[in-house]
A protein has these predicted regions:
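Acyl-donor-binding surface of acyltransferase catalytic domains
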Residues: 70-151, 247, 252-254, 270-274
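A conserved beta-strand-loop-helix scaffold within acyl/acetyltransferase catalytic domains
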Residues: 165-218
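Conserved acetyl-CoA-binding loop-helix of GNAT-fold acetyltransferases
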Residues: 74-83, 215, 221-238, 260
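Conserved beta-hairpin
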Residues: 43-48, 100-114, 183-197
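C-terminal appended segment following the main domain
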Residues: 226-279
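A conserved beta-turn-beta hairpin within the catalytic core of GNAT-like acetyltransferases
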Residues: 55-64, 116, 203-211, 220
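Short amphipathic alpha-helix that is part of the acyltransferase structural core
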Residues: 1-28, 66, 119, 129-173, ...
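N-terminal charged segments
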Residues: 1-86, 168-169, 180
Length: 279
C-alpha cells in the first residue's frame, strides 16, 4: 500500500507564510516595473501589515495582500489603503485569506465592498521523499534560463497564450518584466533543444511560489507542464524550501493538474471590490 503524503496544517501560520510569499513576489514585480519604466508610477506601500501595490490601472497585480492577516484592520488603515489607489487613479481590490481576522471582513462589508472572485491557494511539502527524481536524458528537458535568455523565456511564455491575441500581447509585456524580478527564477522546457514551455518560481522565507507556466500550442501533450513542475520542485528542495505553493481558478484544469502532482487546496481566497454605487 502506498504511503500517504503528509501536509502542514492549513492554519493561520501557514496562510501568513503563503500570503507573504505571494505579496513579496508581486512587490518584486512592481519594483522591476518601476526600474524598467519609471513613468509607470509602479510602487507599493505597507499599512498595518497589508501590502498595497500599484502596477498600472489595468494590471492584475494592482491590489492588496495580507489584509487582516497579521493584525486587526482599522477604518483609518482602510482609508490609507484606499487613498493610495485613488491617488493613482486605480480601483481598489483586496485579496483576503479566509483565515484573516473576522473583523476585517466586517469592515470591508460596512465600507461597501463585495466578494467577486475566488482563488484556490494550493500547497504541498517539499521534502526529498516527495520531490520527483530528475528525468533521464531524452527529447524533453527542463533547465534554468540564463539571464541573457530573458527575451527567449518571455516570448515562449507569451506564445502559450497566442490563441487569444490580446492576451498574448499582454503576457509578452508582463513576462518581459517578470523575467527581471529580483527573486525570480525562470525555467524553460525544451523539446529536441527547442523551447516549448516556460514557468516561473519565486522564493520567500522557505516558500516556493510557482507561477507563469504555459506551453506553446505546437508543444502541447508532450509532458512539458509536468516536467516543469517536477524541475521546479527539485530546485525548491535544493534551495532549502519546505513548502511549495501555487494558485489556480477553482475547478480549473490547472488545479486538477496540480492535484495530480501532489498539491492540495489550503484554502479558497476571496477578492473584494467596491459595490456599484458605494462611495
Amino acid at each position: 500500500m502506498a504511503e500517504l503524503r503528509t501536509y502542514p496544517f492549513a492554519d493561520l501560520a501557514l496562510s501568513q507564510r503563503l500570503e507573504r510569499a505571494e505579496a513579496q513576489s508581486n512587490m518584486d514585480f512592481v519594483e522591476a516595473r518601476a526600474r524598467a519604466f519609471p513613468e509607470s508610477r509602479a510602487r507599493h506601500i505597507e499599512v498595518a501589515g497589508v501590502h498595497a501595490m500599484f502596477d498600472g490601472i489595468d494590471s492584475p497585480l494592482t491590489q492588496t495582500f495580507c489584509l487582516g492577516l497579521t493584525q486587526p484592520l482599522t477604518s483609518e488603515d482602510l482609508d490609507r489603503l484606499e487613498s493610495f489607489f485613488k491617488d493613482l487613479g486605480a480601483p481598489v481590490f483586496h485579496e483576503v485569506s479566509p483565515l484573516a481576522d473576522p473583523s476585517a471582513l466586517a469592515l470591508l462589508n460596512r465600507a461597501g465592498y463585495e466578494p467577486f472572485e475566488f482563488t484556490s491557494v494550493m500547497y504541498q511539502r517539499v521534502t526529498a521523499d516527495v520531490v520527483p527524481a530528475g528525468a533521464k536524458p531524452g527529447r524533453l528537458a527542463v533547465r534554468l534560463a540564463r539571464r541573457d535568455e530573458n527575451e527567449v523565456w518571455a516570448q515562449t511564455s507569451a506564445r502559450g497564450w497566442s490563441e487569444t491575441p490580446e492576451l498574448g500581447e499582454f503576457m509578452l509585456a508582463f513576462s518581459r518584466v517578470s523575467a527581471h524580478k529580483a527573486s525570480g527564477h525562470s525555467f524553460l522546457a525544451e523539446l529536441d533543444g527547442q523551447p516549448i514551455a516556460a514557468g516561473g518560481l519565486t522564493i520567500h522565507e522557505g516558500v516556493a511560489l510557482f507561477a507563469g507556466a504555459s506551453t506553446v500550442p505546437e508543444g502541447r501533450r508532450q509532458g512539458a507542464q509536468n516536467a516543469l513542475l517536477a524541475a521546479r520542485l527539485r530546485f525548491a528542495l535544493e534551495q532549502g524550501c519546505d513548502v511549495a505553493m501555487m494558485c489556480a481558478l477553482p475547478g480549473s484544469a490547472s488545479q486538477r493538474n496540480a492535484e495530480r502532482q501532489g498539491f492540495r487546496i489550503a484554502y479558497t481566497r476571496i477578492k473584494w471590490r467596491r459595490r456599484p454605487g458605494s462611495v
